[in-house]
Amino acid sequence: ANSVCFTFTDFESGQQDLIFQGDASVGSNKALQLTKVDSKGNPQGGSVGRALYTAPIRLWQSSSLVASFETTFTFSISQGSSTPAAALTFFIASPDTKIPSGSGGRLLGLFGSSNNAGSDNGVVAVEFDTYPNTDIGDPNYRHIGIDVNSIRSKAASKWDWQNGKTATAHISYNSASKRLSVVSSYPNSSPVVVSFDVELNNVGPPDVRVGFSATTGQYTQTNNILAWSFRSSLMGYQAN
């Protein structure tokens, strides 16, 4: 479709319009639990989960016909261990995307160890990272980053994660300016802003799926999406 619009005010188990991968499920609290928790709600280590909107979305048709989109979601991350880990992402990928082998922990459920810097996986992601891995290029603080076909963020800003609190994220892409922008905040705190210019028609296929991924490692955290809305519109303009 040339334009797509959907809203989830909460989630249901057996949700037909979502594809669940790995450990992702819907909890009794009607939240999208991207990673595994035990019967008491305690997060489990070594978990990878993803959830994608079922219908593919037409992101571009030609270099001069590229979609603009915006998405807003609320989420919460609660630490299970003394240190939380690892991350939650909103991502865009090819319609047949699966969890890559070996993509747990620091690789966000998006990049296998073999292709974490490849240009062929067509992945664009916004990561909310509670555990800096400086050896793979993370800044040495908790951050929100924009990833394009690589685990190494193209742009990142410091993020003051708040344990168990509900955050709001707003991500938009302007196809005329080619700017991907992220604004995220907790109640009563200053928003974190990150942006990066990217030509989405040069990154991945015309049709994509959108959704969320999350991981835990040796250290753990819950990764819950509470509500989600998305809309996109394919508009013609003169691209360079």
Curated annotation (Swiss-Prot):
- Please tell me where Mn(2+) binds in this chain: E127, D129, D138, H143
GO MF, any single term: metal ion binding
Q: Which SUPFAM superfamilies match?
A: Concanavalin A-like lectins/glucanases
Coiled-coil positions: none
- Give the residues the record marks as binding Ca(2+): D129, Y131, N133, D138
What's the family? Answer: Belongs to the leguminous lectin family.
Q: What is this protein called?
A: Lectin
